[in-house]
Design a protein with these regions (language model features):
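Extracytoplasmic gate region of multi-pass secondary transporters
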Residues: 55-56, 250-313, 371, 375, ...
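Helix-breaking motifs and short loop linkers at transmembrane-helix boundaries and internal kinks
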Residues: 67, 99, 120-126, 137, ...
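Central cavity-lining transmembrane alpha-helices of secondary-active solute carriers
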Residues: 78-92, 299-312
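Conserved MFS/SLC helix-loop-helix module at the cytosolic interface between two early adjacent transmembrane helices
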Residues: 86-125
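Cytoplasmic helix-loop-helix junction between adjacent transmembrane helices
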Residues: 130-171
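Helix-loop-helix hairpin linking two adjacent transmembrane segments in secondary transporters
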Residues: 165, 169-218
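C-terminal transmembrane helical hairpin of 12-TM major facilitator-type secondary transporters
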Residues: 327-374
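A late C-terminal transmembrane helix in Major Facilitator Superfamily
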Residues: 382-417
Length: 464
């Protein structure tokens, strides 16, 4: 009996693999203009993180202007995350209700104006308030981005589409680290915020004018539009057809897989925000670098993360096309990346600047790619694509709940110990924990209905 069952499972696996290969051949020759949307997501997140890194590079100048301590700067670094966290789920619900276009250009304009306000701040209080407004605007980026990916990306391209979204962030951090340093030296720290904010306003106008859903995009061929719509996955399970957004949110919160994804994102997000907020200060304090060199050495790990992230995003989609259990392959890849990123634990024990750069580059590239793959895995596991916006919100909330703590905890650790060794230790332990969580927790489909969807075999669906 076991032998017979094994043969049946083997035949089913071979049949599925052959079907996937036929599907892949069937889209050969279909245009890929949808990649313009993926590039648009890259640019969107590029500007998002350009505005974020501005504060990190300008931190030394701002601290001198207002006579701020490391603890004071820790609160300034994390201020935008407070409103960011509060607004994530509302922004996800708005993205699901109104789509990616309206929510994106509105909030992009808002956070760009908040960046300009940061440059115009005249006190610690106004500086803090400007970062709170920045958090409101930027909280929509990933929920809207996740919604746009579900609207535009066939399932076999969600990895690379998510990589474009996430790598735009690291491209912004890479270029911004150098660009903002040069702007500060040339014009001053206030002017750097004016210039980066103006770039965002221009992008908001462009997004309003150019972006449309596939159904309304006149520049798409009929064949490409049909391919996109056939794999969107917005048909709900029967029990969830009339589900309200609030009930959908409750269903997500009851899903063990959703909670595991969010916790994994948090373990990875702590390290990301540690680098994003304190990396320039770490390099300046421990290596005695000036503003321009600090920006340059901060840029290198982000550049590596952007390039490697796109490559690994493409590779994860290749795994999906070849494997009979694609979600398991993506999950395993995330765990491996988190384990590799824990090389940050070795940072306090090396002295050479090139070796420190290498360790940070590997850690940042792996953690950034793991977070991008987590977005793709969420879309893969979510059965009802109509609620991808709020699902992405919960995922990003997990990342940013931990991320909010990173700059504050690091500030206290640095103030108490006079160094960064303890900060790197905390990050490394969380990365190891995240690898365990993703392997053990995110194994089943994310269902919003209370009644499980049962396949023809009579057994509840399970992802291995």
């Amino acid at each position: 009996m076991n032998y017979r069952d094994g043969r049946i499972r083997g035949r089913l696996a071979v049949s599925k693999t052959r079907k996937m290969k036929r599907d892949r051949r069937s889209v050969v020759g279909v245009q890929k203009k949808r990649y313009l949307v993926y590039i648009g997501l890259f640019v969107l997140m590029f500007i998002n993180y350009l505005d974020r890194v501005n504060l990190s590079v300008a931190a030394k100048s701002i601290a001198e202007t207002y006579s701020l301590s490391p603890i004071d700067m820790g609160y300034i670094f994390s201020a935008f995350l407070w409103t960011y966290l509060v607004c994530l789920i509302p922004m996800g619900l708005l993205a699901d209700r109104y789509g990616g276009r309206a929510i994106t250009y509105t909030t992009l304009g808002l956070w760009s104006l908040a960046g300009i306000w940061t440059g115009a701040a005249t006190s610690y209080g106004s500086l803090f308030a400007s970062r709170l407004v920045l958090g409101i605007g930027e909280s929509a980026s990933y929920p809207a981005g996740g919604k746009i990916i579900r609207e535009w990306a066939p399932q076999g391209e969600r990895g690379i589409a998510s990589a474009f979204l996430n790598c735009g962030a690291h491209g912004g951090l890479c270029v911004g680290s150098v660009l903002v340093g040069a702007l500060i030296l040339q014009f001053g720290w206030r002017e750097s915020f004016y210039i980066t904010g103006a770039i965002g306003v221009v992008m908001a106008i462009a997004w309003f004018a150019l972006y449309r859903r596939p159904e309304q995009a006149s520049w798409l061929s009929d064949a490409e539009r049909a391919l996109i719509l056939s794999e969107r996955g917005e048909t709900a399970p029967r029990a969830a057809t009339d589900m309200t957004p609030l009930n959908a949110l409750k269903g997500l919160l009851r899903s063990p897989s959703m909670l595991a994804l969010a916790l994994t994102q948090g373990c990875a997000g702590y390290t990301l925000y540690l680098f994003m907020t304190w990396l320039p200060s770490y390099l300046a304090a421990t290596r005695g670098l000036d503003v321009l060199k600090t920006g340059l050495f901060s840029a290198i790990p982000y550049g590596v993360a952007a390039i490697l992230g796109l490559g690994l995003g493409w590779y994860s989609d290749r795994l999906l096309k070849r494997s009979t259990s694609s979600n398991a392959e993506r999950r395993k890849l995330i765990a491996v990346l988190l384990l590799l990123s824990s090389v940050i634990l070795a940072t306090p024990f090396v002295e050479a600047i090139w070796l420190i750069e290498a360790l940070i580059s590997v850690s940042l590239a792996c953690v950034a790619t793991a977070m991008a793959m987590n977005i793709a895995l969420t879309a893969d596991l979510l059965e009802d694509g109509r609620y991808n916006g709020v699902a992405t919100s919960l995922l990003i909330m997990g990342g940013n709940t931990f991320g909010t703590a990173a700059p504050i905890v690091t500030g206290y650790v640095v103030a108490a110990t006079g160094g960064f060794s303890g900060a790197f230790l905390i990050a490394g332990v969380l990365l190891l924990g995240g690898a365990i969580v993703i392997l053990s927790g995110a194994r089943n489909p994310i269902r919003l209905a209370s009644t499980p969807v049962v396949p023809a075999s009579g057994r509840a669906a399970h992802v291995t």
